[in-house]
Amino acid sequence: MSLWGGRFTKISNTEFDSFNNSLRIDHRLIKDDIKSSIAWSKILLDVQVLTKKEQKIIENTLLSILKKNKNNFTKILSSNSEDIHSWLETTVINTIGDLGKKLYTGRSRNDQIATDLKLWCKRKSKKICRRIIQLQNDFLDNAYLHINTIIPGYTHLQRAQPITFSYWCLAYIEMLERDRLRILNLTQFLNSSPLGSGAISGTSWEIDRKKLAFFMGFSEITKNALDSVSDRDFILDILSAAAISMMHLSRFSEDLIFYNSGEANFIELSDSITSGSSLMPQKKNPDILELIRAKCSSVYGSLFSMFSLLKGLPLSYNKDFQEDKNHLFSGLDIWEDCLKISSLVLKNIKLKKSNCKKSAQLGYSNATELAEYLVKKGISFRDSHHITGKIVIASIKKNKCLEELDLLFLKKYCSKIESDVYQHLSLESCLNKKNSIGGVSNKQIKISLDQVKKRLSTFK
């Protein structure tokens, strides 16, 4: 049944219907459409459109429809309804007769869909927050396992200074914490109810919009009906949060792809999360990580598509909005999936500790410590930097680590170098000197781990 057929003298073209209908996309809003409809029935009771008995019949009918269809969309999708709103209205009327027609008094699909989308975003954001927290816990588990596992830290993809795998995990925990906080910050925009705004200018029924908002779990109401039905900023906000978080997951994937490569050979991915080559039998490919990296671009596409969709629209509602759900659902589904898969990856990696440490040593990542040692011997940092550079060149020619060079050889470059230099050049010493807050020292890492553990324990 069409919700707007009374104005027209001809039935709509079937090709137009196929092009115009959105049920195949927005059927996912059934929980939210029913939640907002139940709230609306309660407000209609307040303004005496419905009796107490009628409201209860409608509410029970809606709950029954939800129970039958919330986990199985087959019946919904077999319908020829235009969208989830018209499907629900038709189903209610077919179930309880003319009483069902009263439910839509004073309400437009314009404020209805704006409300449903906010309700859906609130539900989805809670699920994503749980995924983020789970991934943080998986990083934390790895961080505790590898407090003493030394790996090279990189700048410009060149070995720079030694760090630990634990420290690397902590870096991603912090990125994910910002992602979680971004979602929490969105609640101020998702917590205002547009329902009661009507088509564009409000409703003539004297409804209590604040009470209506409370019924649905909103903390406040929108202030302007024209803006309320036009607003899709909250979709841009949540997709922006998704895009930033996916960028973090893409960087995580790139790190592990490199660590897994034959050139680095720091980690091994489990057979259960890798694939092979149809031609080259020796291959064990990190497809799972490459797909996370690739799917980042899909989420960017969802965000940019929403910007493009909205940029030229006049106030207020336009049919262009029908496409917003494609971008919203796709972007957030990918984000949630990638968070889940990232957790799977962290449960299926094995570190090659000796390879990691050897790479840190041969990368001369302790060169900065040698330069700082010379500064403490009274040499200016610039001269110390120059002397250390010369020693590194000599080490490379000898194919030795700095700590493997004998004292007489080192003294050729600076007579102030003494036997105590070796205690400064060990990678463990390099790490533990970085004892500033947030540094890589064993002490600071343990402090950070305890702080993260305490923070995450509040969500259990």
Curated annotation (Swiss-Prot):
Q: Which GO terms describe its cellular component?
A: cytosol
Q: Which PROSITE patterns match?
A: FUMARATE_LYASES (PS00163)
Q: Which reaction does it catalyse?
A: 2-(N(omega)-L-arginino)succinate = fumarate + L-arginine
- A molecular function GO annotation: argininosuccinate lyase activity
Question: What would be one Pfam family of this protein?
Answer: ASL_C2
| Gene3D superfamilies in UniProt | Fumarase/aspartase (C-terminal domain) (1.10.40.30), Fumarase/aspartase (Central domain) (1.20.200.10), Fumarase/aspartase (N-terminal domain) (1.10.275.10)
The UniProt entry's GO biological process terms, in alphabetical order, are: arginine biosynthetic process via ornithine; L-arginine biosynthetic process
Belongs to which family? Belongs to the lyase 1 family. Argininosuccinate lyase subfamily.
Protein name in UniProt: Argininosuccinate lyase
From what organism does this protein derive?
Answer: Buchnera aphidicola subsp. Cinara cedri (strain Cc)
